[in-house]
């Protein structure tokens, strides 16, 4: 018996993995997660997550059109997420977006994950891309940290999942609309730059 946590509050708990989200959820309801219970609760969470994981998943406004435009302009696109690879691919398939990406890596794709630069560098390697010819777009401190550590310019979106104000993350640019991305990316990395 715990109180329900409003969706807007949950939004601020997302971004550092399911275990951290559970810890934050427990703290929000007034009681810390009991030591040793995390594995059991993770199993329960993942069971419910797998049953209804796509019910509320939608791209943010302008994302699909912008991805299509960037791809048509000759940019390679990738996803570098800490979400496990399998669920990431399932979501992309349900949304009909998997064909837009040249590489997709999850938190279980390499021995390391964001903010370790090996995660982003490994993703770039799958596309035969160099850090100087890439741009990271993200919504969290982990995204900015991995980009910085890998030597990749980074653009942060202002409407993502972070507990820190996005303008304090240290990104090179902050955008309020995904539609603004195309012009900024073209300035940072001209099409065809290797």
Predicted region positions:
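Conserved phosphoryl-transfer catalytic core
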Residues: 1-8, 19, 29
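Asp-based, Mg2+/Mn2+-dependent phosphohydrolase catalytic module
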Residues: 7-8, 32, 47, 84-194
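Short, acidic loop-to-helix structural element flanking the phosphoryl-transfer center
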Residues: 47-79, 85-90, 114-117
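Short polybasic/polar patches that bind polyanions
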Residues: 1, 23, 27, 71, ...
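A broad detector of the eukaryotic-type serine/threonine protein kinase catalytic domain
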Residues: 1, 26-27, 50, 54, ...
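PIN/NYN-family metal-dependent endoribonuclease catalytic core
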Residues: 11-15
